[in-house]
């Protein structure tokens, strides 16, 4: 009898998932599943401390980055980051050489090499400061759009942002550089971060993604017209 009851329960469960004409009506949340398939970021909602400015900016930056890479299928270029890492690596090399040389040739014999390494290290730090200030600026993403025909160079899309300390105004700038003409165009918005986060500090992509898409589409339309 227990087996029959179990079988009946299973049959009832299956029957509850089948509607008229044998169509499946299981409540699997198909609408939400479709949304999750489209936006991977929604698999793990971004939740931060709303009073932590760095966390707020980083979460908005990362989410904007995901929109360009996942929705528009652009390919990230790591050239800017590689440049910074190269400078840092060279700086660390001078520091390591100074450490090893001083171990092998105790001071004051190591004095000339130590002086050279120290000077070189600070020169590289100066170069790094110039690089981050004038080359990287506030850019956190460089992405390439491949030409479908393979005839023209890649179009370049750049994302940069700013959020001043103790300010709730977040600015996101999207820059488009034509691979064919090298012309550059920009679009940006400045919004209160309260528009994009709920009371618990969770990023609301339904409010944030359309703003990014509007920026992108405004530049994409200009590109097609020209």
Swiss-Prot record:
Residues recorded with modification N6-acetyllysine: 169, 191
Listed transmembrane segments: 87-107, 112-132
Cell compartment(s), UniProt: Endoplasmic reticulum membrane
Coiled coil: none
Lumenal side: 108-111
Membrane topology, Cytoplasmic segments: 2-86, 133-226
One BP annotation, GO: signal peptide processing
Keyword line: Acetylation, Endoplasmic reticulum, Membrane, Transmembrane, Transmembrane helix
Record's GO cellular component terms: signal peptidase complex
Pfam entry (one): SPC25
Function, in words: Component of the signal peptidase complex (SPC) which catalyzes the cleavage of N-terminal signal sequences from nascent proteins as they are translocated into the lumen of the endoplasmic reticulum. Enhances the enzymatic activity of SPC and facilitates the interactions between different components of the translocation site.
Family matches, as PANTHER family: MICROSOMAL SIGNAL PEPTIDASE 25 KDA SUBUNIT, SIGNAL PEPTIDASE COMPLEX SUBUNIT 2
Protein known as: Signal peptidase complex subunit 2
Lineage: Eukaryota, Metazoa, Chordata, Craniata, Vertebrata
């Amino acid at each position: 009898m227990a087996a029959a009851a179990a079988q009946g329960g299973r049959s009832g469960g299956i029957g509850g998932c089948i509607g008229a004409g044998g169509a499946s009506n299981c409540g699997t949340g198909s609408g939400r599943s479709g949304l999750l398939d489209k936006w991977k970021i929604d698999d793990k909602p971004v939740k931060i401390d709303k009073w932590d400015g760095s966390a707020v900016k980083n979460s908005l930056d990362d989410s904007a980055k995901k929109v360009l890479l996942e929705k528009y299928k652009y390919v990230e270029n790591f050239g800017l980051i590689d440049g910074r890492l190269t400078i840092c690596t060279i700086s660390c090399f001078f520091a390591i050489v100074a450490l090893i040389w001083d171990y092998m040739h105790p001071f004051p014999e190591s004095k000339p090499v130590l002086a050279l390494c120290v000077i070189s290290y600070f020169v590289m730090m100066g170069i790094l400061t110039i690089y981050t200030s004038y080359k990287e600026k506030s850019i956190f993403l460089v992405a390439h759009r491949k030409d479908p025909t393979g005839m023209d160079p890649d179009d370049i899309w750049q994302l940069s942002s700013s959020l001043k300390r103790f300010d709730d105004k977040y600015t996101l700038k999207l820059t488009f550089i034509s691979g064919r003409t090298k012309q550059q165009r920009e679009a940006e918005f400045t919004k209160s971060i309260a528009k994009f986060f709920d009371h618990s500090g969770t990023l609301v992509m339904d409010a944030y993604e359309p703003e990014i898409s509007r920026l992108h589409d405004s530049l994409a339309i200009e590109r097609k017209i020209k």
